[in-house]
């Protein structure tokens, strides 16, 4: 059974088939924890993959992700993988200089940030010139480089409906040899 599963996408798809209505994620909303099923997560993941394709993301593009743990973090990471992108996760504990180094060194084209850390990103924006779009989770921002994650989700859903085969081709092109993550450890920067 495991021999057929060669990518993270394969593993996730298998879980969606086996447990479609089971809770996959829990997130606190309005003071109470609410479950999101595997199939609901998959829909959000595909919407984000579609949004990335609509933005012009190419296979193997790097996408930095600076956020506390939340459902959108999972949608983002899996959506990147479905679209053939490479996740560059950034700890919220990093200094501004460490964020700049990782974003620049990884050559990230896109940066996903939660609204809680938006001011930090605004403070370093001039130092991360390779980033073309900054996607903000839990925000309604839509100005210049900045765009709301939630808005992209809606646009991604529309794009997906109009370009189903393009997205399916993108997903089928993902192989077990693809780079999916660039993780910087404490010794990575040689500082």
Give a label for each model feature:
Residues 63, 80, 111, 179, ...:
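Conserved S/T- and glycine-rich ATP-binding loop of Class I adenylate-forming
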Residues 2-24, 43-44, 62:
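AMP-binding/adenylate-forming domain of the ANL superfamily
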Residues 12-36, 137-142:
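AMP-dependent adenylate-forming
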Residues 24-74, 78, 95-100, 148-154:
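Conserved AMP-binding/adenylate-forming core of the ANL superfamily
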Residues 68, 92, 187-190:
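Short, conserved catalytic or interaction motifs in soluble domains
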Residues 82-155:
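Structural core segment of the AMP-binding/adenylate-forming
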Residues 20-23, 157-184, 191:
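Conserved pre-ATP/AMP-binding loop-to-beta segment of ANL
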């Amino acid at each position: 059974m495991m021999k057929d599963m060669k990518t993270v996408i394969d593993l996730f798809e298998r879980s969606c088939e086996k447990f479609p209505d089971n809770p996959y994620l829990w997130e606190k909303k309005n003071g109470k924890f609410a479950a999101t099923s595997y199939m609901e997560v998959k829909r959000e993941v595909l919407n984000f993959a579609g949004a990335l394709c609509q933005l012009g993301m190419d296979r193997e593009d790097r996408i930095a992700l600076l956020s506390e743990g939340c459902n959108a973090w999972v949608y983002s990471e899996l959506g990147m993988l479905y679209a053939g992108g490479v996740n560059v996760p950034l700890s919220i504990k990093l200094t501004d200089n460490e964020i700049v180094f990782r974003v620049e060194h990884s050559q990230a084209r896109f940066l996903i940030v939660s609204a809680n850390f938006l001011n930090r990103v605004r403070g370093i924006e001039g130092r991360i010139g390779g980033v073309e779009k900054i996607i903000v989770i839990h925000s309604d921002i839509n100005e210049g480089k900045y765009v709301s994650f939630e808005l992209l989700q809606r646009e991604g859903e529309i794009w997906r409906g109009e370009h189903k085969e393009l997205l399916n081709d993108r997903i089928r092109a993902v192989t077990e040899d693809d780079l999916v993550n660039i993780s910087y450890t404490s010794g990575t920067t040689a500082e």
